[in-house]
From Swiss-Prot:
Protein's UniProt name: tRNA-specific 2-thiouridylase MnmA
HAMAP family, alphabetized: tRNA_thiouridyl_MnmA (MF_00144)
Coiled coil regions in record: none
Span list, region Interaction with tRNA: 149-151, 309-310
Gene3D superfamilies: Adenine nucleotide alpha hydrolases-like domains, HUPs, Translation factors
Keywords from the UniProt entry: ATP-binding, Cytoplasm, Disulfide bond, Nucleotide-binding, RNA-binding, Transferase, tRNA processing, tRNA-binding
Broad EC category: transferase
Family annotation (Pfam families): tRNA_Me_trans, tRNA_Me_trans_C, tRNA_Me_trans_M
Protein's job: Catalyzes the 2-thiolation of uridine at the wobble position (U34) of tRNA, leading to the formation of s(2)U34.
Site (Interaction with tRNA): H127, Q342
Subcellular location(s) per record: Cytoplasm
EC number(s) per entry: 2.8.1.13
Binding site for ATP: G11, M12, S13, G14, G15, V16, D17, S18, M37, G126
Length: 372
């Protein structure tokens, strides 16, 4: 089958990465369709909807490239599957990663299903990751070549079935090259800045946004031995290892968040970047997913490396099943400020094995106060 007989539906955001993705596939001769996903009603205070601006850029790029385009609305699915989860996690005192859930439930489920109904053979996105297809049909996901932009961390929940229908055309080139291609082709998005922050918050103030949905409950900020250091404005506004916004003055080392007590509405703080309370030896994680589950013996356990947050250096770990629903991940050396609600993502070299959601964090001598 030649490329012209293979239909690829590209998820287009109005940014440079997805624009170049569509261009590359068109140049390679595929039957390309561009689709813009509207996942959030983001009309700002002035009545301007940034999604409309982004869709206008998609239209212009698709016209430049010469491919058809459509828009699809997933606002309900996004609210039900991503935003509700986001709020529930904050209510539990955790720090969620909505991008992971958005990829799992929207971009590579709702959007993938929609594309297949349009007769797509594959979907493609502008993610910095790579797919390796083996002769027997199974696939592996590899880190993007641009180490600074690699996005496998956010794709860790994707299954073999999902990845078998996915292309990441820019995963094997550097971001600077993506910009160069866009400029060379005169694409309107060539100099558009990258989006930052959580997709549905955009440039809004995080505290202000969250307070619209969850009532803040101020409480005491204390040290682990009970010394009161001030007031916090609501546990949901703080994450483990956070330094800024505590409002603790005085001399000496800066102060950091080392834990939360939901029952008593207490925020624990301690002084010093390397305070012992910030370090842990192992974690328990649930909702685990592996691209190739049969390759990993969870009962015997296996060694690999892991990331506990985006753009973090890999840490050597040992992964083993804790029970029917959870994994125990033991670190080769203590790790600082691991945060419940975030993803732990596993690697063998460049291959992303999968990931899980961090639930509880421990020192060898017992559970930490991270979220209790």
């Amino acid at each position: 089958m030649s490329n012209k007989d293979i239909r690829v539906v590209v998820g287009m955001s109005g940014g440079v990465d997805s624009s170049v993705t569509a261009h590359v596939l068109k140049e390679q001769g595929y039957d390309v369709i561009g689709i813009f996903m509207k996942n959030w009603d983001d009309t700002d205070e002035n009545g301007v909807c940034t999604a409309t601006e982004d869709y206008n850029d998609v239209i212009e790029v698709c016209n430049q490239i010469g491919i058809p385009y459509y828009a699809v609305n997933f606002e309900k699915e996004y609210w039900d599957k991503v935003f509700t989860y986001f709020l529930d996690e904050y209510k539990k005192g955790r720090t969620p990663n909505p991008d992971v859930m958005c990829n799992k439930e929207i971009k590579f489920k709702a959007f993938l299903d929609h594309a297949m109904n349009l007769g797509a053979d594959y979907v493609a996105t502008g993610h910095y990751a790579r797919i390796h297809r083996h002769e027997d049909g199974h696939v592996e996901m590899l880190r993007g070549v641009d180490n600074n932009k690699d996005q496998t961390y956010f794709l860790n929940q994707l299954s073999q079935q999902q990845l078998s229908k996915v292309m990441f055309p820019i995963g094997d080139i550097e971001k600077s090259e993506v910009r160069r291609i866009a400029e060379e082709q005169g694409l309107v998005t060539a100099k558009k800045k990258d989006s930052t922050g959580i997709c549905f918050i955009g440039e809004k103030n995080f505290k202000t946004f969250l307070s619209q949905y969850l009532p803040a409950q101020p409480g005491d900020m204390i040290t682990l031995d009970g010394k009161k250091m001030g007031k916090h404005s609501g546990l949901m506004y703080y994450t483990i290892g956070q330094r800024h916004g505590l409002g603790i003055g005085g001399d000496g080392d800066p102060w950091f968040v080392v834990g939360k007590n939901l029952k008593d509405n207490v925020l624990y703080v301690e002084q010093g970047f390397h305070h012992d309370a910030l370090y842990s030896d192992y974690l328990i994680a649930s909702d685990y997913s592996f691209v190739n589950p049969e390759d990993n013996d969870l009962d015997q356990g296996f060694e690999c490396t892991a990331k506990f947050r985006y753009r973090q250096k890999d840490t050597k770990v040992f992964v083993k099943r804790e029970n029917d629903h959870a994994l125990r991940v033991t670190f080769a050396e203590p790790v600082r400020a691991i945060t419940p609600g975030q993803a732990v993502v596993f690697y063998q070299g460049d291959v992303c094995l999968g990931g899980a959601t961090i639930d509880d964090v421990f020192k060898n001598e017992g559970q930490l106060n991270f979220v209790v």
